[in-house]
Amino acid sequence: MVDEANFREKMKKDGYGDATVRDFLPNHSLPTHTHEFGASLLVLDGEITITMEDRSVTCQTGDIFALDANVPHAEQGGEEGVRFLVCRK
């Protein structure tokens, strides 16, 4: 399991910008959208599901997920919400 400090260090080495903490309230969702940047996240607490055209991935505390730029996806926080670090590239 990767901790917050190691995640920040790895992201910096991989060319990502500073990490930002994001919080979703329980069951908060974002409809399908894209970003003009790649993103990598580390779940600090809770659960989040990212749904793309061909699959869904549920990440829990300690999990890392990366998404390339311009990939359509939706985001769904878990029943108890989610707190995660996210970096852009």
Predicted regions and their residues:
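Conserved short histidine dyad/triad with adjacent acidic residue
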Residues: D18-H35, A69-N70
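Ligand-binding loop in jelly-roll beta-barrel domains
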Residues: A69-K89
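Short acidic-glycine-tyrosine-enriched beta hairpin
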Residues: E53-N70
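A generic beta-sheet turn/junction motif
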Residues: L25, E36, M52, G77-E79
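Structural motif
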Residues: E47-T49, S56, P72, G81
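A short, N-terminal "cap"/entry segment at the start of jelly-roll beta-barrel domains
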Residues: M1-D23
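Short, conserved beta-strand element in jelly-roll/cupin
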Residues: T34-I50
